[in-house]
Amino acid sequence: MNSSDLISVIIPVYNVEKYVGSCLESVCNQTYKNLDIIIVDDGSKDSSNKICEDYALKDSRIRIIHKNNAGLGLARNTGLEHVKGKYVAFIDSDDFVAANYIEAMLNGIKRSNADTCYAGYYEYYDDNNIISKPARYDSTIFTNNAIIEKVLLGMIGTEPSYKVDFILPMSVWHALYSSEIIQQHNIK
Protein backbone atom coordinates (compact mmCIF):
# COMPACT_ATOMS: atom_id res chain seq x y z
CA MET A 1 0.00 0.00 0.00
CA ASN A 2 1.25 3.47 -0.87
CA SER A 3 0.98 5.48 2.32
CA SER A 4 1.20 8.66 0.27
CA ASP A 5 -2.38 8.16 -0.94
CA LEU A 6 -4.25 10.95 0.82
CA ILE A 7 -7.74 9.92 1.91
CA SER A 8 -10.34 12.66 2.40
CA VAL A 9 -12.94 11.88 5.06
CA ILE A 10 -16.09 14.01 4.94
CA ILE A 11 -18.03 14.28 8.20
CA PRO A 12 -21.27 16.31 8.04
CA VAL A 13 -22.19 17.62 11.50
CA TYR A 14 -25.55 18.90 12.72
CA ASN A 15 -26.61 18.92 16.39
CA VAL A 16 -24.83 15.71 17.37
CA GLU A 17 -23.05 16.80 20.56
CA LYS A 18 -23.84 13.41 22.13
CA TYR A 19 -21.99 11.45 19.41
CA VAL A 20 -19.52 13.63 17.50
CA GLY A 21 -16.67 13.17 19.98
CA SER A 22 -16.75 9.39 19.54
CA CYS A 23 -16.93 9.82 15.78
CA LEU A 24 -13.92 12.13 15.64
CA GLU A 25 -11.96 10.00 18.07
CA SER A 26 -12.48 6.95 15.84
CA VAL A 27 -11.44 8.84 12.70
CA CYS A 28 -8.39 10.52 14.25
CA ASN A 29 -7.17 7.16 15.59
CA GLN A 30 -7.25 5.29 12.28
CA THR A 31 -4.34 2.93 11.60
CA TYR A 32 -4.00 4.68 8.23
CA LYS A 33 -2.75 8.15 9.10
CA ASN A 34 -2.62 10.09 5.81
CA LEU A 35 -6.07 11.61 6.20
CA ASP A 36 -7.66 14.89 5.17
CA ILE A 37 -10.54 15.18 7.66
CA ILE A 38 -13.23 17.58 6.42
CA ILE A 39 -15.90 18.48 8.96
CA VAL A 40 -18.89 20.31 7.49
CA ASP A 41 -20.77 22.04 10.29
CA ASP A 42 -24.26 22.39 8.85
CA GLY A 43 -25.34 25.19 11.18
CA SER A 44 -25.36 23.25 14.45
CA LYS A 45 -27.12 24.99 17.33
CA ASP A 46 -25.76 22.77 20.12
CA SER A 47 -22.14 22.34 21.25
CA SER A 48 -21.19 20.18 18.24
CA ASN A 49 -19.17 22.99 16.67
CA LYS A 50 -17.19 23.59 19.89
CA ILE A 51 -16.38 19.88 20.14
CA CYS A 52 -15.19 19.88 16.52
CA GLU A 53 -13.10 23.03 17.08
CA ASP A 54 -11.43 21.37 20.09
CA TYR A 55 -10.48 18.36 17.97
CA ALA A 56 -9.18 20.61 15.19
CA LEU A 57 -6.87 22.32 17.68
CA LYS A 58 -5.38 18.92 18.58
CA ASP A 59 -5.18 17.43 15.07
CA SER A 60 -3.85 19.42 12.09
CA ARG A 61 -5.49 17.01 9.63
CA ILE A 62 -8.91 18.45 10.51
CA ARG A 63 -10.50 21.26 8.51
CA ILE A 64 -13.88 22.69 9.48
CA ILE A 65 -16.25 24.29 7.01
CA HIS A 66 -19.14 26.27 8.46
CA LYS A 67 -22.36 26.74 6.51
CA ASN A 68 -26.00 27.48 7.08
CA ASN A 69 -28.20 24.46 7.66
CA ALA A 70 -29.29 22.95 4.36
CA GLY A 71 -29.42 19.22 5.11
CA LEU A 72 -27.19 16.17 4.97
CA GLY A 73 -26.90 15.88 1.19
CA LEU A 74 -25.82 19.48 0.69
CA ALA A 75 -23.38 19.21 3.61
CA ARG A 76 -21.79 16.19 1.91
CA ASN A 77 -21.65 18.06 -1.40
CA THR A 78 -19.97 20.99 0.35
CA GLY A 79 -17.38 18.55 1.64
CA LEU A 80 -16.84 17.20 -1.88
CA GLU A 81 -15.93 20.71 -3.04
CA HIS A 82 -12.96 20.64 -0.62
CA VAL A 83 -11.61 17.13 -1.22
CA LYS A 84 -7.83 16.87 -1.67
CA GLY A 85 -7.46 13.10 -1.39
CA LYS A 86 -7.13 10.45 -4.07
CA TYR A 87 -10.01 8.67 -2.33
CA VAL A 88 -12.93 9.90 -0.26
CA ALA A 89 -14.99 8.38 2.53
CA PHE A 90 -18.13 9.73 4.18
CA ILE A 91 -18.69 9.11 7.88
CA ASP A 92 -21.86 10.30 9.59
CA SER A 93 -21.17 12.25 12.77
CA ASP A 94 -23.32 9.96 14.92
CA ASP A 95 -21.28 6.93 13.83
CA PHE A 96 -17.87 5.64 14.81
CA VAL A 97 -15.60 3.37 12.82
CA ALA A 98 -13.15 0.56 13.57
CA ALA A 99 -9.50 1.57 13.86
CA ASN A 100 -8.61 -0.17 10.58
CA TYR A 101 -11.69 1.01 8.64
CA ILE A 102 -9.86 3.20 6.11
CA GLU A 103 -6.81 0.95 5.83
CA ALA A 104 -8.89 -2.17 5.16
CA MET A 105 -10.92 -0.50 2.41
CA LEU A 106 -7.84 1.07 0.81
CA ASN A 107 -6.18 -2.36 0.82
CA GLY A 108 -9.28 -3.74 -0.92
CA ILE A 109 -9.12 -1.06 -3.59
CA LYS A 110 -5.40 -1.59 -4.18
CA ARG A 111 -5.66 -5.39 -4.20
CA SER A 112 -8.44 -5.34 -6.81
CA ASN A 113 -7.47 -2.20 -8.73
CA ALA A 114 -11.01 -0.98 -8.01
CA ASP A 115 -12.57 2.48 -7.79
CA THR A 116 -14.77 1.72 -4.78
CA CYS A 117 -14.71 -0.62 -1.80
CA TYR A 118 -17.72 -1.32 0.41
CA ALA A 119 -17.48 -2.40 4.04
CA GLY A 120 -19.74 -4.27 6.40
CA TYR A 121 -20.90 -2.53 9.55
CA TYR A 122 -22.60 -2.91 12.90
CA GLU A 123 -25.72 -1.13 14.07
CA TYR A 124 -25.61 -0.08 17.73
CA TYR A 125 -28.81 0.94 19.49
CA ASP A 126 -29.37 2.85 22.72
CA ASP A 127 -30.79 -0.31 24.32
CA ASN A 128 -27.35 -1.98 23.83
CA ASN A 129 -28.66 -4.11 20.98
CA ILE A 130 -25.96 -4.72 18.32
CA ILE A 131 -26.72 -6.05 14.85
CA SER A 132 -23.93 -7.17 12.49
CA LYS A 133 -24.30 -6.22 8.82
CA PRO A 134 -21.38 -7.96 7.09
CA ALA A 135 -20.39 -7.07 3.55
CA ARG A 136 -22.42 -9.45 1.39
CA TYR A 137 -19.93 -9.90 -1.42
CA ASP A 138 -16.49 -10.03 0.17
CA SER A 139 -13.76 -9.70 -2.48
CA THR A 140 -16.24 -9.57 -5.37
CA ILE A 141 -15.41 -7.30 -8.28
CA PHE A 142 -18.22 -5.83 -10.34
CA THR A 143 -17.56 -4.52 -13.86
CA ASN A 144 -19.61 -3.28 -16.81
CA ASN A 145 -23.21 -4.55 -16.77
CA ALA A 146 -22.80 -6.17 -13.35
CA ILE A 147 -22.42 -2.70 -11.87
CA ILE A 148 -25.83 -1.77 -13.23
CA GLU A 149 -27.55 -5.11 -12.65
CA LYS A 150 -26.16 -6.02 -9.25
CA VAL A 151 -25.10 -2.79 -7.60
CA LEU A 152 -27.12 0.16 -8.91
CA LEU A 153 -30.46 -1.64 -9.19
CA GLY A 154 -29.97 -3.06 -5.72
CA MET A 155 -29.24 0.38 -4.30
CA ILE A 156 -31.89 2.32 -6.16
CA GLY A 157 -34.64 -0.26 -6.17
CA THR A 158 -36.44 -2.18 -8.87
CA GLU A 159 -39.79 -3.55 -9.83
CA PRO A 160 -40.91 -6.23 -7.34
CA SER A 161 -40.77 -8.88 -10.11
CA TYR A 162 -37.09 -8.15 -10.87
CA LYS A 163 -34.83 -10.40 -8.80
CA VAL A 164 -31.76 -8.63 -7.42
CA ASP A 165 -29.58 -10.82 -5.25
CA PHE A 166 -27.20 -8.05 -4.24
CA ILE A 167 -28.68 -5.51 -1.88
CA LEU A 168 -26.48 -2.58 -0.97
CA PRO A 169 -27.66 -0.14 1.68
CA MET A 170 -28.65 3.15 0.11
CA SER A 171 -26.03 5.30 1.79
CA VAL A 172 -22.53 6.52 1.09
CA TRP A 173 -21.10 6.04 4.59
CA HIS A 174 -19.87 2.45 4.32
CA ALA A 175 -17.47 2.84 1.40
CA LEU A 176 -14.29 4.36 0.05
CA TYR A 177 -14.57 6.01 -3.38
CA SER A 178 -12.17 7.22 -6.04
CA SER A 179 -12.20 11.02 -5.97
CA GLU A 180 -11.34 11.03 -9.66
CA ILE A 181 -14.51 9.10 -10.56
CA ILE A 182 -16.64 11.45 -8.45
CA GLN A 183 -15.11 14.51 -10.11
CA GLN A 184 -15.11 13.05 -13.65
CA HIS A 185 -18.81 12.30 -13.49
CA ASN A 186 -19.74 15.33 -11.38
CA ILE A 187 -21.40 13.06 -8.83
CA LYS A 188 -23.21 15.06 -6.17
Please give the residue ranges for each predicted region:
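Short aromatic/hydrophobic "clamp" motif used to bind/position activated sugar donors
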Residues: 88
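Donor-binding/catalytic cores of nucleotide-activated saccharide
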Residues: 96-188
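Short beta-strand/loop segment that forms part of the nucleotide-sugar
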Residues: 35-43, 63-68, 92-93
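A conserved acidic beta->alpha catalytic loop
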Residues: 26, 41-50, 68-70
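Short, conserved active-site loop motifs that form the nucleotide-linked donor/cofactor pocket
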Residues: 7, 35, 61-63, 114
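Acidic helix N-cap motif at the loop->helix transition within catalytic regions
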Residues: 21, 35, 46-54, 96, ...
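N-proximal low-complexity "stem/linker" segments adjacent to membrane-targeting elements
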Residues: 1-29
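Glycine-rich, basic loop-to-helix element that forms the pyrophosphate-binding segment
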Residues: 67-83
